[in-house]
Each structure stands twice: as structure tokens, then as C-alpha cells.
Amino acid sequence: MGLLLRSALFKYIIIVLIMLNLRGYVLAEQEQGSQIPLEEIIQVGVTRNKIMTAQYECYQKIMQEPANGKEGHFCNRTWDGWLCWGDVSAGVISEQRCPDYFQDFDPSEKVTKECGKNGHWFRHPDSNRTWTNYTRCNTFTHEKVKTALNLYYLTIIGHGLSIASLLISLGIFFYFKNLSCQRITLHKNLFFSFVCNSIITIISLSAVANNQALVATNPVSCKISQFIHLYLMGCNYFWMLCEGIYLHTLIVVAVFAEKQHLMWYYLLGWGFPLIPACIHAVARSLYYNDNCWISSETHLLYIIHGPICAALLVNLFFLLNIVRVLITKLKVTHQAESNLYMKAVRATLILVPLLGIEFVLFPWKPEGRIAEEIYDYVMHILMHYQGLLVATIFCFFNGEVQAVLKRHWNQYKIQFGSSFAHSEGLRSASYTVSSISEIQGTTYTHDYSEQSNGKNCHDMENVFFKTEKQYM
């Protein structure tokens, strides 16, 4: 009973001291309030709150942990003003991560505290007071700020290029009606998910990275934007999975699917990613409710990354099985259609490892300043240039798209040439019109058959319905 009373009294004393300390800070702020900007006051308040919370938790830990039962000299557990230190054997240098109280402190660096051989904490010779070595916390701050700024601009440029290339690709798909088919519809949804993700990423980075006061106040809107970002990131990968499932159904089980129902793809691509995003939001608010949910130092991110990795693995399995079937068909029948499908599969097969490698590298962040910097640059390129990569492979390198663009470009050149010839008066109007009509018809037929072997998007989807099951 006496022990409980003493513990409660000690807690009360700690709380009173903290409150008195806080009152002194508030009075000092009121005296100088007219001179200090609001953003700095908010930041200082957040820093003090973190320190006082850590101080209270440290005193709780000091009281509740059992006494050190080891033999020999040791340094007693203590609070040094910023960090909590446990019992340390004599002659040992204890270390832990730097705190994140201040903007110029790097939490990835280490703080050290030396326990002397006599069982007393090291005292600094200048002040003769116990001393903790925090010097490494801001030794490389300037270099890391430069790196962070470079990564910020790299990210913004990557998403800007992604948005531009994806919008151009969507314009091509919507403008040229002869490209319309179910596979292109899946491409459109995939591209749109990447556009939305890039837009929300740029908005979030512009608002958060340049506004520490916003992060300090921790508004709900900040967390909502992070929730939307994680949801859209999931949509990117599940629409990639839809691409793989569609091709697998079309090529491997085409006998059972004359026309696929896209509603299931919409549910998988737009609906399913809501589940892990909502679970992550609830778990984050309960177990790791950091400001704006921007920290990556939590295993709760695997709630998002786990389903994405599963989608990538399933997609890879489907694509490898498709390649097996196509190779079998090529060996037996030497069909030209199999070559066309192989080109379509090859694009997806290239993208899946490129989009998934970031999740392979994510848990393996190396130690060391230079290695970490290289890792950060590689990860940012892999993560933030995905939209540009998707648009390039699925649209700009697409043979059908290139054939359509070339055909329309040739038509434009012919029409422009006819207008120029007409203005010069080189031919009569009737002769010019009839000649151009003949040339246009000839150009259209020759160019398209040469590029696509006489097959369009719908032909490619339907050709495998006619193949024999023995090659499956």
C-alpha cells in the first residue's frame, strides 16, 4: 500500500513540475508574442509537447522497471533532458536514435552516452556536468537538406512528366475511335488511376513539404489526402492486375469467354483497394497516429504493401502462363496472331517487374550516408516516374497506336500538300480533289495492313475464340 501511495505521489509531483514548466513557457511566449511569427510558436509548442511527453514516459519507465540485479558497477537509468537512458554496465557506451524534436536533427543518426568504469555517467570537462553526445544529430543536416530538396524536385518533375504523357495517351485513345476495344478500355482506367495519383501526390507534397506549420497542427485534411494517395497507389497496381487477368482470360481460357464483362474489372481495380486503405487508416489512427501519417517508420504500411505485392505476384504468374501458351501455339501452328498477342503480353510482362521492384527494395534500406542517398534516388525514380513508363510502353511504343498515328500523319501531309498546291494554282480544283481521294484510299489500305497485318483491336480479341483447345 505504501509503495502504491509513493508511486502515485511521485506521478503527481512529475505532472505538477511539467505543468509549471509549461506555464513558464506560455508566459514567456505571451511576453514576446508580438515578435515571434505564428508558425514558429506552433512549432515550438509541438516540440515542447514532444519533450514533455517523452519526459513523463521516461519517469514512468524508471519507476515501473525492476531494479538492476546485475553484479558490478553500472550507471543508473536517467532522463538527460531530451532522451531516456536505461541502466548501463560500467565501461559501455550506450546509443540510440536522435530525437525528432528539432528540424535540424536527423532521426537516422545516433546519440551516444558513455558510462564510466566507476559506474558514473561521463561528465564534460568544461562544465563538469553529465553529458550526452548529440553532435552527430545535426552534423550532416545541410547535406541531407540539399538531398531532400533534390528528391522533392525529382518527384515533382516525375509526376509532372507522368501527367503530361498520360493525358496525351488518353487523348489518343479517346480521339481515334478505331482503337476502341476492351483492352484499350483497361488501359484508359489504368492511365486515369496514375493521373489521379500523380495529381494528389503533387498537391500533398506542395502543401506538406513547404508548410511545417500545417504538419504541426495535424489537420484531418492532411490525413485524408494521405488516405487518398495510398488508395490510388493501390488502384495503380490492381489495374495492372486487371490487365494481366484480361489477357490470361482472353488467351488461355478464351473458349469460355466470348465477351468479357468489364464490371468485375471495375470492382477489382477501383473497389478492392478501398479495403486495405480503410484498414490502414483505422490502424494508423489507433496505433501510430503520427502527424499527417507521413512517417514510413511503421510496419502498418504492410497493410497497403501486402495486397500490392500479392497482386504483382499473381500478375506475374498469369503472364508467365500466357507466355507458355503462346510459345506452344507458335511451335505448333506458327500463327501470325500469336505473334501479335506476344507483343501485347510483352509490354505487360516488362512493366510488372519494373513497377514491383520498389516493394522488393523497400525493406532493405542500406546503412551509411552515401548508400542511403543512392537508395533514395533509385527509389524515387522507380516510384514517381511510373506514369511516364506506363504511358510510354502501353501507348507510345504500341504498334497499333503507331500505325494509326502514322496513317493520320500521312493523310495530314497529303491534305496539307493539296491545299498548298491549290493555293499556287498548279492544278485545277476538280483534278486535285479526285487525285487526293484516290491517294488517301491507297495510303490508308497499304499502311494499315503493313503495320497490323490486316488485324485491328477487335480482331486480336476474337482470334483466339477460333483456336483449338488442344494447344492450351
From Swiss-Prot:
InterPro entries: GPCR_2 (IPR050332), GPCR_2-like_7TM (IPR017981), GPCR_2_calcitonin_rcpt_fam (IPR003287), GPCR_2_CGRP1_rcpt (IPR003289), GPCR_2_extracell_dom_sf (IPR036445), GPCR_2_extracellular_dom (IPR001879), GPCR_2_secretin-like (IPR000832), GPCR_2_secretin-like_CS (IPR017983). One of its GO terms (molecular function) is calcitonin receptor activity. One of its GO terms (biological process) is cell surface receptor signaling pathway. Disulfide bonds join C58-C84, C75-C115, C98-C137. Residues 1-28 form the signal peptide. PROSITE patterns: G_PROTEIN_RECEP_F2_1 (PS00649), G_PROTEIN_RECEP_F2_2 (PS00650), G_PROTEIN_RECEP_F2_3 (PS50227), G_PROTEIN_RECEP_F2_4 (PS50261). May function as G protein-coupled receptor for calcitonin-gene-related peptides and adrenomedullin. Specificity may be modulated by accessory proteins. May activate cAMP-dependent pathway. This is Calcitonin gene-related peptide type 1 receptor.
